[in-house]
Design a protein with these regions (language model features):
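Short amphipathic beta-strand starts and helix->beta connectors
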Residues: 33-41, 79-86
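Sterically constrained small-residue positions within well-ordered secondary structures
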Residues: 1, 44, 90-92
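Active-site pocket-lining segment
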Residues: 37-51
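Glycine- and Gly-Pro-enriched alpha-helical subdomains that act as flexible
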Residues: 2-38
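Residue-identity detector for glutamine
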Residues: 20-24, 43-44, 80, 95
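Short basic, glycine-rich beta-strand/loop surfaces that mediate nucleic-acid
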Residues: 9-11, 48-66, 70-162
Length: 162
């Protein structure tokens, strides 16, 4: 088992009833389980943590010319190399109705892992490179893993509970 705490985060369409959102989220968790059952992180979450965070993912539309926000968010998460479980509901025209992914405490525990509070350049938007690098490397042993964690923290700030 890992020393991390995990939560299963997921996005669902805004226009489903709360019970339908929960059911679709559950379907996606089953898909995640099918693909990642033997992963250490999944086992830690399933045996010890068991927390769901269901977020409003906006619209769903599989049409390539006008994809829904849920579909676009899924693409973003996959492009970051984050393992996902996704579900498309046959009774809703096979539209994407949920996707889920595990998040560890470095993303959601802002008390133990605070946001960047270092210096900024004169434009007040760009963090001082050395300060920022030192801050982000507290999250992981590799820069790639630290960048993934920082990306998830930034990504999840955009959502509200479903």
């Amino acid at each position: 088992m890992t020393n991390r705490n995990y939560r299963m985060y997921g996005l669902v369409p805004y226009n489903l009833s709360p019970i339908q959102q929960g059911i679709q989220f559950g379907h996606a968790v089953v898909e995640y389980t099918n693909d990642h059952f033997h992963d250490e992180e999944y086992q830690q979450w399933a045996k010890n943590d068991k927390t769901f965070i269901i977020l409003n993912g906006g619209t769903t539309n599989n049409t390539r010319l006008k994809e829904g926000t849920l579909n676009l968010y899924l693409i973003e998460v996959i492009e970051q190399g984050i393992p996902v479980g996704e579900f498309s509901e046959p009774d809703l025209g096979d539209q994407l109705t949920a996707f889920v992914f595990l998040v560890d405490d470095r993303v959601f525990d802002k008390e133990a892992w605070p946001d960047y509070a270092g210096g900024y350049y004169a434009d007040m938007r760009t963090p001082i490179a050395e300060d920022y690098y030192n801050w982000k490397m507290k999250f992981a042993e590799t820069e790639k893993e630290a960048d993934r964690i920082i990306w998830l923290r930034s990504f999840l700030k955009n959502f509200k509970l479903a």
